[in-house]
Regions:
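N-terminal hydrophobic membrane-entry segments
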Residues: 1-195, 199, 203, 212-214
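Alpha-helical heptad-repeat coiled-coil segments that mediate oligomerization/polymerization in large
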Residues: 206, 216-217
Length: 217
């Protein structure tokens, strides 16, 4: 039984698009790729990485759980962050819901260059979002989502390059102004539509009067 257990501990099967970082006495030894791999028992051990997992409880409420795992997924990942408050340049507090798509390109850097990769990516995305949206007014934030996405993508890609991570896309799911601001915007939009209707009606009556006068003449 001891011999069989030792033999089984030497064998590591890694799935496609996944890797395992192996350490020997606490020092990086090698990276196990997809397929059948052989390691030295006792001396070689897999290094765990902190990772985010979204779970749903009995009541149907989703929550994020960060747990250590030995396998590193090289496929494109998506982090859906909770809404956060951002103060715009005209001192309006809005809620922004963002999503981040990224992929681990260098598993060794992702393991050793940052202590907690998911937490670091989340904190960096939130602070960068506050900086970008804080330089814009409310109207600019509502009408310039592509600009915010591109600026965030540039900042995140440059900052995470040291961690062996490639940020592919940053998307803003929703921008929610305060309730009183929404009511004011609706009143403004309604007033603008009424003004346009009055102008069109006046222009129509004016044109009708001109044509009628020309006909009488």
């Amino acid at each position: 039984l001891i011999v069989v257990s030792v033999i089984l501990s030497c064998i590591k099967v890694v799935k496609q698009n996944q890797v395992i970082v192996i350490e020997r006495f606490g020092k990086y030894q090698k990276t196990l790729r997809a397929g059948l791999n052989i390691i030295t028992p006792v001396m070689d051990r897999p290094r765990a990485m902190m990772w985010r997992h979204k779970q749903t409880d009995i009541s149907g409420i989703e929550y994020v759980l960060t747990v250590p795992q030995t396998t590193i997924d090289l496929r494109e990942q998506v982090f859906d962050f909770a809404k956060q408050n951002v103060i715009t340049a005209d001192n309006v507090t809005i809620e922004i819901d963002a999503m981040l798509y990224f992929q681990i390109m260098d598993e060794k850097a992702a393991m050793y260059e940052i202590a907690n990769l998911p937490d670091a990516i989340e904190k960096l995305c939130k602070t960068s979002l506050r900086n970008v949206a804080g330089n814009m007014t409310l109207d600019q934030c509502l009408t310039s989502r592509d600009k915010i996405n591109s600026e965030l993508l540039t900042i995140m890609d440059e900052a995470t390059d040291k961690w062996g991570v490639k940020v592919n896309r940053v998307e803003l799911k929703d921008i929610t102004p305060p309730h009183d601001i929404q009511q004011a915007m609706e009143k403004q939009m309604r007033a603008e539509r009424e003004r346009r209707a009055i102008i069109l009606t006046s222009e129509g009556e004016k044109q009708s009067a001109i044509l009628e006068a020309e006909g009488v003449r």
